[in-house]
Structures are given as structure tokens and as C-alpha cells.
Amino acid sequence: MHLEIIYWKLNKDGISLDDLNMHIDKENILQWKKIKEIESKIWIENKNEGWWGAIIVWKNKKPPLSELPKNIPRAIIKRPPDIRLEFSIVDKI
């Protein structure tokens, strides 16, 4: 399994966490649930520091971007994430 952590520091963009959170709706979640390679996706925020992003656990390899739902947050923020980290999962409980 693989873990991907993606997040943006938003205080310089004029975009609120609420602006992004309103796009985590039933339709968006259903689109992500259709991705068979995904184990779980967790949307995260830090209101004090203005961080917003997601943690994704992939069962195997991440599929090509063309097979994933549209990246709505990136379209709203209009820039790549500040942090994108990828890890191999050694073990879990």
C-alpha cells in the first residue's frame, strides 16, 4: 500500500477553508468511492494555520490522473499543493 499526503497553505491565496470544504459533498465522495485502487481518502484542515488538504491510502499504485476525479481544490486554488509526500506503507493495524 501507498500513502499520499497533499496540502496547501491558504492564508496567502484569499481562499477560506470553508470555500474548499463545501466541495466535499456527496457527489464528490461518490466519485472517489468509485476508484477501486483507493483504500481511503481523508480530507484534513488546520484552521489555526490555514492548512487544507487530503491523505490518501492507495491499495497498490496510484492510477493515472486521467482516471481520477477532477481535482476541484487545485482548480479553486489555482496552483499546485505546497506539500505532496508519498510513502510506502510498511505495516498497519
Residue ranges and their predicted role:
Residues 1-52, 61-69, 81-93:
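Short S/T/G/P-rich N-terminal loop/turn motif that feeds into the first structured element of a domain
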Residues 72-80:
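A common structural junction motif
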